[in-house]
Every structure is written in C-alpha cells, then in structure tokens.
Amino acid sequence: MLTWLAEFAVYFTPLNLFRYITFRTGGAIATALFFVFFFGPNIIKSLRIKQGKGQPIRSDGPQSHLLTKKGTPTMGGLMILSGLFVSTLLWANLSNHYVWVVLWVMLGYGAIGFYDDYLKVTKQTHNGFSGRGRLACEAGVALVACIAMMKLGTPHMTSLAFPAVNGYVVDLGLFFLIFGPFVIVASGNAVNLTDGLDGLAIVPVMIAAGTFGIIAYLVGNAIYSDYLRINFVPGAGELAVVSGAVIGAGLGFLWFNAPPAQIFMGDTGSLALGGLLGTIAVAIKHEMVLAIVGGLFALETLSVIVQVVSFKLTGKRVFKMAPIHHHFEQLGWSEPQVVVRFWIIAFVLALVGLSTLKLR
C-alpha cells in the first residue's frame, strides 16, 4: 500500500525508498513485530478467558507436559496471521498477484486450522476436523492458488527445476495442478506436525521464510537470476516483503511462545504458515529446494509416516513416540535441548538450500 508514496519522490526524494524491496522488507519486519508485541497480551488474555481449559494435552506424551502445558490457550496463530496480514498490506505492492495468492492460502489454511482448533478446544479432544474433510479443504484452497499462478504467472510456472543441476527443467504441464497443490498441502501439514514444543516450529518457519525471501528477491531480479542461472520470475521479488512480515510476526510470537509458553500457535498458525511457505516455493519455482530448507519439517512428517506404517505392518513402533521430537524427549532430552538442537538443524539446512543457488 505504501508503495504509492514513491510516486511523490519528485517532490520529496526520500520517498523513493518505497520503491525498494529491501527497504519495504525491513518495514514489514518491524511492523509485524510491533503489531504482535502490542496486541499480543490482549489477544492472549481474551483467548485464555474464552477457552478455559486451553488446548488438550496428549496423555501418552511426556508427563512433564501435563504439568507445564495444561491450561495454556491455543489459536495463537491469530496473533501471527493478523500481524503478517496488516504488515503485508502496508508494505507490499498490492498490484502484485503473487502477494494475493500467498495471502489467499495463508487465510484459507488459517481458517481451516482455526476450525480444527475450535473443535478440539470446545470438545476437549484431539479429534478436531476430520482428516479427509480437512485435506479436501486444504487441497481445494491450494488448487485455486495454483490455477491462479498458472493463469497469471510466466510460461515457466508449470516447470520444475532441480537444485544443483544447471539447465535441466521439466515442464509439468497440467500435472502442475496436482504437483503444486501437493507441495502446498504437504508443507502446511509438515509444519503442523512440527509444532509440538514451545518455540519448536516458529523459529524454523522464520529461518525458512528468510531463506525464501532471499531466493524470491534473486528470482525476481533479471540480473541476479541470469547470473545464477535460475528461472526469472517477474514480480516474485515482492514475496520477499511477505517473507519479512513472517519473520517479524514470528519474532513477536516467540516472545510469548518461549518456554514456558503463554500461548500455542495451534493449527491456526502452523497450518497457515506451512501453506504460505509452500506457496512461496511454488511461486518462485524452488519447490525442490523447499525439501532441503524445510528438511526439519520433512523429517517430522517422515517419522510419523514410518511409525504408522511400521505399526500397521509389524505391530512394532520404530520410535518411542512420533513425531520425532517426542522420541528424543522420551530418550531423556529436555524440551529446551530438543528445541534448540532442532533450530540448529533448521539453520544448517537453510544454508545448504541457499548453497544450491550457486551449485549450477
């Protein structure tokens, strides 16, 4: 929204700053951060009053959780998404269709997650929105987003590039309408599975957002994309501003989510943020890099799949508990140890993902 101020730069030169993505990304970080800081306490207070018992805690998990997490309100994603949305509206170029596609997925997945959280809190059960119904809604939202990107994007939108491989691109054609939604749905649910400990999911989300913000900026710049030999996606650089808003809102939320957490983001936040990351990856044509940068989320998801398949086929469990962060808790790691070590893994994977830009 504030980009229009650049038109008056002829009268006041400093207004020219609003043309620059880097400046607006910084503004988006600061705005989202202070929004969550300012409104966070009141949102937490309101949710605590309305939810009463808060999010139900798994009885089969670490016993310490029943003592330290019981009564903690959920739906903290409302704080994150509100700050992210307001900041994006202020600092992003609202004529950019990629911005609206990403916001569509974020709000759509946020609504699905909110409904899931609502059912869990009101019924005090872990059985919220039915699995099939939830996946169908997620796929529908993602499909609309991919159709929009296919219609409004560049001819490269249906292509699939491989990291560290120069010039090898596969045109997916109409299969893009299956692959794209799969990436978005998988990303949303992977982050959702990771959100099981205080601060565990939000920091890797911010790391991934920062990484994809850098990639989006490079992909949206004709000179940089040509130098790095990656597909140029006009307008994709604007997603760096959205990524900045994610970082700012995430930092604000972490202030309240740091152990012991005052609030959980719930499916409202984790599903929306995961879907947002997946959509950005699809938009900037770095879906395969998402598997690297979001490797921690992939690991959490894989641990659940392996656990379920193993138990159904053999009656035995591979892990003491899934997702895998609970496995390490059962091995004796303290919650802060699991969280910080997983943050380190996420940071290293982000560096590996960025390095693929140069390995061509």
UniProtKB/Swiss-Prot annotation:
The pathway to which it is assigned is: Cell wall biogenesis; peptidoglycan biosynthesis
Query: Where is the protein localized?
Result: Cell inner membrane
Could you tell me the superkingdom of the organism this chain comes from? Bacteria
List its EC numbers. 2.7.8.13
Q: What is its main location?
A: membrane
Q: Do you know which InterPro entries this protein is assigned to?
A: Glycosyl_transferase_4 (IPR000715), PNAcMuramoyl-5peptid_Trfase (IPR003524), PNAcMuramoyl-5peptid_Trfase_CS (IPR018480)
Cofactor needs:
Mg(2+)
Annotated signal sequence range: none
For this protein, the parts annotated as crossing the membrane are 27-47, 72-92, 94-114, 135-155, 167-187, 199-219, 236-256, 263-283, 289-309, 337-357
User: What membrane topology does this protein have?
Assistant: Multi-pass membrane protein
UniProt record, GO biological process: cell division; cell wall organization; peptidoglycan biosynthetic process; regulation of cell shape
A GO molecular function held by the record: UDP-N-acetylmuramoyl-L-alanyl-D-glutamyl-meso-2,6-diaminopimelyl-D-alanyl-D-alanine:undecaprenyl-phosphate transferase activity
HAMAP family (alphabetical): MraY (MF_00038)
What family does this belong to? Belongs to the glycosyltransferase 4 family. MraY subfamily.
Protein name, as recorded: Phospho-N-acetylmuramoyl-pentapeptide-transferase
Q: Which organism is it from?
A: Beijerinckia indica subsp. indica (strain ATCC 9039 / DSM 1715 / NCIMB 8712)
The gene for this chain is mraY
